[in-house]
């Protein structure tokens, strides 16, 4: 009897240790939900982004999505409730049905494990939804409806996102990348998460002061790379500013130039517990931004397409990269504008197989893919490519050439075909895909390093392509993310706006203090 009782007691103790932490332990370890929704979507493109374009991670999959969770120290600092992360490569505007579906599924999962001490909200910040302004502001309000205002929300963003007053108010902590290209994307998210855990562990809770300053500047990302001045120095000033006593974090958003809402402009924020330090930090960064506004220029020399091609054909340097920037799918272009490829194939230099070698990456063309797969490698194929989504500048293009490669299984493209037309290797995809790595080319049997000219639908070159180029020009081609912002027909952004309104007066760059969430007077 005595032994039985002891075993029973032991089982009871083990169960208590294993299944539910003591109330003491529960207090020490905050309960945090992980939530994410991200896309950058252009309203100047006829493309739409539907739910099937979003990659999603649910439940425990989310721990492997974030590389920093391999650090068990961070894992052990909280009880985590991963919900749903949805991300799409940039594209066109999101229909309300897709938005409601993604938000609804995420909120349903969020409702399951309440209450929360914290929510980590991972967004891009430049989502556009048909008929809905400021989707991220809407999303965070709906998260608040679920979790209430006792919960701290830490929002992590892309520096090309937009920060409305509503988003700033509902976020207790908020930050964004400090590098473009975004080599610090994971590090920034980790900072947002660690700041949240710190505030919960220390029981300091919501920061007392959040300063928000709208800066009336709207610039394309291709003019604001932090690899070159003036963005390099501007963004380098952020980290030291956050070392001050009473300042938790600060951030500068360039904002998103290819959507037309009042929230599309640059923003500076700082927050912490010392009102003066917070206000001054935000004001200094905002003034710095405004003072260097005239120094922003394109990351590479630019030209019309013909100017770029003339120079590349003339050049002895190879590979000579040309960015087909107006239809860059990673900024929100449809990715199927045929204008550039049409112009390239018209050039006499590329008509013969002995012309300068050129790789064109890439154009979606499901009709050609189907014919090429049927005909096989080495066969002649003729079919239309592109112009299904965005035919405003040129119609679908009939190309006729030899199939050089057929590769199946890419997660974005699904099927990729290389068709040789004259001296041009055209990469045709079933679905649109950005070409950002050397392997993207070599997988298809192409050698970009030994090619005279490589044209990519991209803006600034991502690091791997940048390191490969012998020379580089950015062609100002038409499309949904036209780099020449003055060609865009803005109706709803705030005016005056630099550089659209050249002679505007200096704006008011004093700090506006956003109410602590839930304390709106
Ligand atoms: Zn970005």
PLM regions with names:
Residues 113-118, 316-318, 451:
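Short acidic/histidine-rich motifs immediately flanking catalytic phosphotransfer sites
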Residues 33, 38-40, 44, 96-100, ...:
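Active-site histidine-anchored catalytic micro-motif
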Residues 15-18:
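C-terminal motif of bacterial Sec signal peptides marking the signal peptidase cleavage site
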């Amino acid at each position: 009897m005595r032994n039985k009782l002891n075993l029973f007691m032991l089982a009871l103790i083990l169960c208590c240790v294993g299944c539910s932490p003591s109330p003491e332990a529960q207090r020490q370890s905050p309960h945090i939900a992980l939530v994410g929704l991200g896309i950058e979507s252009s309203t100047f493109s006829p493309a739409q982004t539907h739910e099937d374009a979003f990659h999603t991670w649910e439940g425990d999959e989310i721990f492997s999505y974030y590389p920093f969770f391999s650090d068990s120290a961070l894992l052990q600092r909280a009880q985590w409730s991963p919900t749903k992360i949805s991300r799409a490569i940039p594209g066109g505007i999101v229909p309300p049905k897709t938005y409601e579906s993604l938000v609804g599924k995420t909120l349903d999962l969020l409702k399951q494990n309440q209450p929360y001490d914290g929510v980590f909200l991972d967004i891009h910040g430049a989502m556009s939804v048909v008929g809905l302004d400021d989707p991220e502001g809407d999303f965070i309000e709906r998260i608040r409806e679920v979790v209430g205002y006792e919960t701290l929300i830490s929002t992590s963003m892309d520096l090309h996102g937009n920060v409305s007053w509503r988003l700033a108010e509902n976020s207790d902590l908020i930050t964004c990348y400090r590098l473009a290209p975004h080599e610090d994307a994971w590090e920034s998210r980790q900072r947002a998460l660690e700041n949240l855990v710190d505030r919960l562990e220390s029981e300091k809770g919501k920061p007392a002061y959040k300063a928000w300053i709208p800066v009336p500047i709207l610039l394309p990302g291709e003019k604001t790379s932090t690899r070159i001045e003036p963005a390099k120095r501007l963004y380098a000033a952020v980290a030291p500013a956050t070392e001050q006593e009473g300042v938790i974090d600060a951030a500068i958003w360039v904002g998103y130039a290819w959507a037309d809402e009042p929230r599309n402009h640059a923003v500076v924020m700082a927050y912490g517990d010392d009102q003066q330090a917070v206000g001054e930090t935000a004001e200094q960064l905002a003034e710095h931004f405004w003072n260097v506004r005239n120094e922003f220029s394109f990351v590479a020399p630019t030209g019309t397409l013909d100017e770029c091609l003339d120079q590349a054909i003339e050049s002895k340097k190879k590979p000579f990269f040309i960015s087909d920037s107006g239809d860059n799918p990673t900024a929100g272009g449809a990715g199927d504008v045929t204008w550039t490829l049409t112009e390239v194939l018209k050039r006499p230099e590329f008509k013969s197989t002995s012309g300068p070698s050129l790789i064109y990456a890439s154009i979606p063309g499901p009709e050609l893919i189907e014919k090429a797969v049927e005909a096989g490698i080495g066969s002649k194929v003729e079919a239309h490519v592109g112009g299904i989504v965005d035919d405003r500048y040129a119609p679908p293009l009939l190309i006729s050439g030899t199939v050089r490669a057929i590769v199946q299984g890419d997660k974005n493209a699904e099927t990729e075909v290389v068709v040789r037309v004259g001296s041009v290797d055209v990469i045709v995809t079933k679905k649109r895909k950005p070409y950002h790595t050397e392997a993207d080319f070599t997988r298809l049997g192409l050698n970009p390093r030994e090619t005279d000219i490589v044209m990519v639908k991209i803006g600034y070159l991502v690091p791997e392509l940048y390191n490969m180029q012998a020379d580089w020009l950015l062609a100002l081609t038409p499309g949904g993310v036209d780099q020449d912002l003055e060609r865009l027909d803005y109706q709803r952004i705030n005016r005056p706006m630099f550089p659209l309104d050249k002679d505007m007066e200096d704006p008011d760059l004093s700090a506006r203090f956003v109410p602590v969430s839930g304390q709106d007077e």
